[in-house]
Design a protein with these regions (language model features):
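Conserved beta-loop-beta/alpha segment of the NTase-like Rossmann-fold superfamily
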Residues: 59-146, 312-392, 431
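Active-site glycine-centered loops adjacent to acidic/histidine catalytic or metal-binding residues
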Residues: 11, 107, 225, 264, ...
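N-terminal glycine-rich phosphate-binding loop and ensuing alpha1 helix
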Residues: 1-60, 246-312
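Conserved beta-strand termini and adjacent loop/short-helix elements that scaffold enzyme active sites
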Residues: 53-55, 75-78, 157, 214-217, ...
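Conserved core of the sugar-phosphate nucleotidyltransferase
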Residues: 111-193, 359-440
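Conserved alpha/beta core of the MobA/IspD/sugar-nucleotide pyrophosphorylase nucleotidyltransferase superfamily
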Residues: 3-5, 14, 167-258, 267, ...
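Alpha-helical elements of Rossmann-like donor-binding domains used by nucleotide-donor carbohydrate transfer enzymes
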Residues: 39, 89-90, 231, 293, ...
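Structural beta-sheet core signal
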Residues: 5-7, 52-53, 102-103, 125-126, ...
């Protein structure tokens, strides 16, 4: 029995246009090989019949991309701004003739183990339930009210409760058993003028279908907003490159010594009843300690100094030189000074935060290291915490840092300082430290960078390809989420 996949592509992608994207949203690349539509098509058997709905004024270059899909048909409709359901309604006469119809948004990505479409006996709304970084503070999705997988009602752009991460969230994939019933339900939405933000949505059609059930996917991501799209791309790239990078960095001469300050109190973790030091939290798919994951992204010829507070870590002795402090310090930079007496003054040092790591160009690092007194790691800050007030931001030109803004909102044309630093020698570190010590109650290495700029040291920045921050409970959850997402089969 034939099955169909309908994908409406008649939108304008205004959020992307407003952010300066030049490619129409469904055709944006999510990785080297696939655009948004490719990733959806590949979830289904090759012989499924594909129906694309496009505007009559769609550019020819996009039509050519659609025409490459085997066993497909394109329907042209008049331009409108009334949402995906209205697009579907404009080809309703064709849909009445067919059955077993999958309907998919163009801007979703999902995975489900053993996804089968051979024998589907009911109308389904495909849903995700659980913690998700994009829904932690946002319920602007469609949600289903269910009992034993039967759907009783669907809301669009709002949840039924305040605990929406425990509700079935419609991912934007639907299955209609019968074309006529599908069209009848669509007509009822439009005839009753059931618009949300002046648009008609397919989810609401299921309120007019008698028998409907929920079917859960394992993982899901909405990539229809520029920030979500960029975050998804970052983690997708991370998953594809991390194994290669970890192998390559093992032989990099990153510095003579590596220092990892880990003597903070971890207040944000304590506030959420996480009572072990954050760098010992189990993270990722393999449940390794955070500090062990960071070690994998550093050269293996070095045994980093790991500076802790009141914590004996004998089981880490094989990888780290653990230095256990008896009392709290005045901050990250102050912590680093506690091991500098063990390092000759002409030796270079690399400082890596205990909760972050980067994937970066090793060749660019080597080039910048040669001409730098201090080399600062920076990021485009593709994170869900992009608007934090606690970040430090740098302004640079041709990699040379011109200014630094500490613990403030993001400034225009700035990059996020990540927490990893190279110092040509400990004398440079100490000169900057002494200046900062006189001025600050909490001495961050960020403060040392600020003093270095004033003293005309050669301070450069390297923009990483991927910046991974696990420094708050939420960011740690995000890391775990994406690690599992891209390892799902």
């Amino acid at each position: 029995m034939s099955k169909y996949l309908v994908i409406p592509l008649a939108g304008y992608g205004k959020r992307f246009v407003n952010e300066g994207y030049k490619t129409l949203k469904p055709f944006l690349k999510i990785n080297q090989n696939n655009n948004m539509i490719d990733s959806i098509i590949k979830k289904f058997p090759k012989n499924i019949k594909k129906i694309f709905i496009v505007r009559k004024d769609t550019e020819k270059k996009y039509i050519k991309l659609i025409e490459k899909y085997e066993n497909s048909e394109i329907f042209y409709i008049k331009p409108h701004n009334l949402g995906p359901l209205y697009s579907i309604n404009l080809i309703k006469e064709e849909l009445k003739k067919i059955n077993n119809i999958f309907l998919s948004y163009c801007d979703i990505h999902w995975s489900k183990k053993n996804f089968q479409i051979k024998e589907i006996k009911n109308n389904y709304v495909y849903c995700f339930k659980g913690w998700h970084p994009f829904t932690a503070d946002n319920n602007n999705y469609a949600f289903c009210k269910t009992k034993k997988n039967k759907i009783y009602r669907i809301k669009e752009k709002e949840s039924f409760t305040k605990n929406w991460q425990k509700e079935p969230l419609s991912i934007g994939l639907f299955f209609f058993k019968n074309g006529e019933e599908m069209v009848n339900s669509i007509e009822k939405v439009i005839n009753n003028n059931l618009k949300i933000n002046n648009e008609y949505f397919p989810s609401l059609a299921f309120n007019f279908i008698k028998v409907k059930k929920v079917k859960f996917v394992d993982y899901f991501c909405h990539i229809g907003k520029p920030d979500y799209f960029e975050i998804f791309k970052k983690w997708n790239y991370y998953a594809s490159i991390k194994k290669i990078f970890k192998k390559k960095i093992k032989n990099l001469n990153i510095a003579d010594e590596i220092i990892i300050p880990a003597a903070g109190l971890g207040k944000r973790f304590l506030d959420e009843n996480i009572n072990i030091p954050k760098y010992l939290c189990r993270v990722g798919r393999k449940k390794k300690r955070m500090i062990e994951v960071i070690y994998e992204y550093l050269p293996n010829k070095k045994h980093p100094y790991l500076i802790t507070l009141n914590k004996k870590l004998n089981y880490l002795d094989g990888k780290f030189r653990v230095v256990n402090l008896k009392s709290a310090t005045k901050g990250q930079a102050d912590t680093v000074t506690k091991v500098l007496n063990k390092i000759p003054k002409d030796k270079s040092i690399f400082i890596n935060s205990c909760d972050t790591f980067s994937i970066f160009s090793l060749n660019l690092y080597k080039h910048l290291k040669i001409k730098s007194d201090i080399l600062v790691f920076a990021s485009q800050n593709t994170e869900t915490d992009s608007f934090t007030n606690e970040g430090t931001w740098i302004k640079s030109k041709n990699h040379k840092i011109q200014d630094i803004f500490i613990k403030t909102k993001k400034k225009n044309n700035t990059l996020r300082l990540t927490g990893n630093f190279y110092f040509k020698n400990k004398d440079i570190f100490m000169k900057c430290y002494r200046k900062a010590y006189k001025k600050e109650n909490e001495i961050l290495i960020d403060n040392l960078v600020k003093e270095a700029i004033k003293m005309n040291f050669k301070v450069y920045s390297i923009i990483d390809n991927v910046y991974v921050n696990m420094g708050t409970p939420k960011l740690l959850k995000e890391f775990n989420f994406w690690e599992n997402y891209f390892n799902a089969k």
